[in-house]
């Protein structure tokens, strides 16, 4: 992906730099940050700019605020970042208001200003050029390091790039790394290449599954989405999650896999319960024996053994989506065991999607995975072969 302008191609010396980060981090009810991976991932790019004598303006969204609310303020992010960098972070009270503009204007080399939540400005999600122009006017250089939002044409991701020429815009280290990993995975995977796809819905991953089939050697389908495939094969799945309107599509994927010589593996047993709760009774049952009115909520021990066998000779594994309702302890075992088996092997292991990254963190396997993507939707769209608006905007025109 060398046609993307990199931060290293830009003369940053003593410039004022705008870095679009992805600080969309999970918080508890008291607004404490529960996972700061995305903040830590931004540090190499921030440090590189500081080392080049820059003054740095950081911007991100957090959640999906309908209005300006302290619940969605980036204050907790500023505090965590200050701790991680061991450096004061100047916090703006707004995005392009008087406070932000004054602080941006007075920012000195080596200082960092964090703007308030970008989505407090209605124009951000509308790719508003006026907002983009206001943001661009604060700085001399634009860097995008927010892979997690590159699939969205938003003001701070796409429109803003129109106000910078190729010598003054580029991709940060995290964005570059994400794109390189996804592109190598699709173009030059070490084989056998196994995709492990889970999560609740087929609809969200249909395009990715279709695009992956010609590229993988084996495909494992788990999680709630597996039941639509099992139903398509004629199994009675009780009250398990089903996307009735996608049965035909599921059949097409199974047929396409067969025609391409790709082995597709589905669960052979499940953890079934009458309700999706920690207190519900549960039992392990073969997929053909799910009791009436019960639902499958995790893969069972025989499926875990089967999937372990399937990935045992893999050289590359791409994992997106948990194997069950991992948020509930008794239905998390399948996902956690998959995480252990994927991380213990010698394969290049790439984890995509927020839920999957949460499983890996909970299993204590994060350090053993080759790469954990910071973007859910964005990593899925790259695998689908789509051009992301935020990435396209950073392409060098000579290479288009």
UniProtKB/Swiss-Prot annotation:
Matches recorded under CDD domains: Phosphoglycerate_kinase (cd00318)
A Gene Ontology molecular function term of the record: ATP binding
Entry EC no(s): 2.7.2.3
Enzyme class, first EC level, given as a word: transferase
Positions bound to ATP: 205, 296, 327, 353-356
PROSITE patterns for this protein: PGLYCERATE_KINASE
InterPro entries linked: Phosphoglycerate_kinase, Phosphoglycerate_kinase_CS, Phosphoglycerate_kinase_N, Phosphoglycerate_kinase_sf
Gene Ontology BP term (one): glycolytic process
Binding site for substrate: 22-24, 38, 61-64, 119, 152
Protein name per the record: Phosphoglycerate kinase
Protein location: Cytoplasm
Keywords, in A-Z order: ATP-binding, Cytoplasm, Glycolysis, Kinase, Nucleotide-binding, Transferase
Record text on subunit structure and interactions: Monomer.
Functional pathway: Carbohydrate degradation; glycolysis; pyruvate from D-glyceraldehyde 3-phosphate: step 2/5
Family per record: Belongs to the phosphoglycerate kinase family.
Reaction it catalyzes: (2R)-3-phosphoglycerate + ATP = (2R)-3-phospho-glyceroyl phosphate + ADP
Source superkingdom: Bacteria
Gene Ontology CC annotation, any one: cytosol
Main localization of the protein described in the UniProt heading: cytoplasm
Record has Hydrolase as a keyword: no
